[in-house]
């Protein structure tokens, strides 16, 4: 009896690790330390708040049909849209530099090299960079209809994430 769920780009409260790299990126942006717009900024991703994913997993366990796959996506947005919404909710607007994928991958390799020297694992790896370079516009209609799944709008989730970072003194 197996039901499969597929979440996309998850953000929100959680560990400060590669598995929560999107929240790390949000934190760095709000702190003024993230100035990169991947490629030309038009790459699309589906962004979903962590609590929506938790609720989606529970709904899939309770209502999901065996052998079925459910996409637990959120709002589809380009990087331009994502950072525009982040600037709005954080009330901080920074000039972002468009960085081509090959240069981003080279930077990722540099971070891996730095890990060998410091022993501290990188928060962003070449694998993460590759994964986030693809267009990932997703549709969760099946999960909405069959499971009752829903998700927070991106702006609202970003606001909750920033509030959580402030409460935990992770923001300067």
Over which residues does each language-model region extend?
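Conserved loop-to-helix N-cap of the C-terminal "lid" that shapes the substrate pocket in Rossmann-like
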Residues: 4, 41-54, 63, 69, ...
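A hydrophobic C-terminal alpha-helical subdomain
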Residues: 37-39, 101-146
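Amphipathic terminal alpha-helices
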Residues: 140-145, 152-172
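Mid/C-terminal beta-alpha module of Rossmann-like enzyme folds, strongest
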Residues: 56-123, 159-162, 169-172
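Conserved beta-loop-beta element that borders a ligand/cofactor-binding pocket
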Residues: 1-13
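Acceptor/aglycone-binding surface of glycosyltransferases and processive sugar-polymer synthases
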Residues: 19-20, 94
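A conserved pocket-lining segment of Rossmann-fold NAD(P)-dependent short-chain dehydrogenase/reductase
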Residues: 25-48
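Proline-centered turn/helix-capping motifs that create local helix->coil transitions or kinks
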Residues: 15-16, 118
């Amino acid at each position: 009896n197996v039901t499969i769920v597929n979440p996309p780009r998850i953000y929100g409260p959680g560990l400060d690790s590669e598995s929560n790299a999107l929240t790390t990126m949000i934190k760095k942006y709000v702190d003024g330390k993230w100035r990169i717009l991947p490629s030309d900024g038009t790459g699309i991703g589906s962004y979903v708040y962590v609590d929506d994913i938790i609720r989606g997993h529970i709904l899939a366990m309770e209502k999901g049909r065996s052998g079925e796959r459910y996409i637990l996506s959120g709002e589809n947005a380009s990087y331009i849209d994502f950072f525009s919404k982040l600037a709005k909710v954080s009330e901080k607007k920074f000039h972002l530099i468009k960085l081509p994928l090959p240069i981003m991958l080279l930077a990722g390799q540099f971070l891996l090299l730095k890990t060998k020297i410091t022993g501290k694992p990188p928060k962003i790896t070449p694998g993460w960079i590759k994964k986030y370079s693809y267009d990932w516009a997703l549709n969760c209609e099946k999960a909405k209809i069959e499971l009752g799944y829903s998700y927070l709008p991106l702006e609202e989730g970003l606001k909750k994430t920033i509030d959580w970072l402030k409460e935990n003194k992770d923001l300067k």
